Every structure is written in structure tokens, then in C-alpha cells.
């Protein structure tokens, strides 16, 4: 039986519009004239902040304390936020300033100002985590799609628990197809790779629009991760 106190999956996505070189262990491709910026989320989570009694998850006030320095890129309509789609390092204090905004929405902009509301951080995302963890623990290898509160999600299970053929058939070329379908308009859509301590893995797309259900990504081309695993 899975326990809430043994996993953590969070996402925080901010549009970045000023250049900073990515570390060598990340492979990304900047967006072109269609306004697509490659999504990379990589951050360290302090799972010790999780409730030990396994009954409570977290409140919005807890979120900044869980984040350490990380790299954040997102799918973005760069015509709204500027044409520079390079990444930037955003430290936890900058994220705190953004998250502490009354409407809890923000983009990291030049000068670390939270001046452009881009994504409402939905804590209902954690309810989706519950659903996915439950289904994967029961050996469900099907693609999962649904909606929770302010956002839509789509989840593709991968190895070691699920046959890689399922993963390849559902994700292969999906990003390109969706990009053509939406004419480059991927505003408010984000991609994650989930790794729960090696017990199960999956790729997850979340967004504010129902188009999320029809989008996918090639993980080999868009690297980044959120650890949702156990701690020693």
C-alpha cells in the first residue's frame, strides 16, 4: 500500500525570457519562430517537508520551502513574453516571491520580477498525483488523461513496470503533430518526467487547455526531471 509520506511530486513552471547557459548534463533545443520554448524542469525537492502522518499533503504556504535552486523552462508563446526563449537559473527565493503573490501565479521575468501572471499553480495537481500513484501501483499501464480543477493532464507510463512499446506508440512524434495542429500555440502546457524512486516512471503533460489530451512529447529530446521518490 503506497503511503503519502513516501513520495513527492510537484511542479512549478515559469516562463523565462533572459539567457543563462544550461549545465552540460541537460540537452535542450530553443524555440523557433513558431513561439515554442522547450520545456525542462529540473529541481531538488526536500521531501522531509512532507507530513509524516501520511494524511496531509501540503498547503500553498509550504511550497516555497520545498524547492531548491533549479532550472525552469516551459512551453510558452514567446510572442507574449519576448523572443528570447533561453533558460535561466531561478533560485528558491525568487520562486518564493512569485508563489507568494495573492493569485499565486507568476512568470520569472528579467530582473526577477513577478510582473506577468502566466500560470496559476494548481494544488489540485497533487490530487492527480494520488490517482496516478494508485493506478500504477495496481499495475495499470494504460495512458491516463483527465482534468483536476484548473488544469488537464495526460500521463504515459514507461519502464520498468510497463512495456516500452506502449510508451513509444503513444508518444512518438506526438509533440510535432500537436505543434502543427495548434500552429505553435502551446501556451500554458508543461512536460515532466516522473521517477518514483525507480519503482515506476512516466512522462506527464499538464496544461490549462483541453488540447493537453492530444499532445505528447519525446522525452529523449526534452530532458528534465522531477524526483518523486523515496528518501534515505
Curated annotation (Swiss-Prot):
Location of this chain's protein in the cell: Secreted
GO cellular component terms given for this protein: endoplasmic reticulum; extracellular region
Signal peptide: 1-17
Key words, A-Z: Glycoprotein, Secreted, Signal
Domain of life: Eukaryota
Post-translational modification: N-glycosylated.
Glycosylation sites: 25-26, 53, 77, 163
Name recorded for this polypeptide: Secreted protein CSS2
Organism of derivation: Saccharomyces cerevisiae (strain ATCC 204508 / S288c)
GN (gene name): CSS2
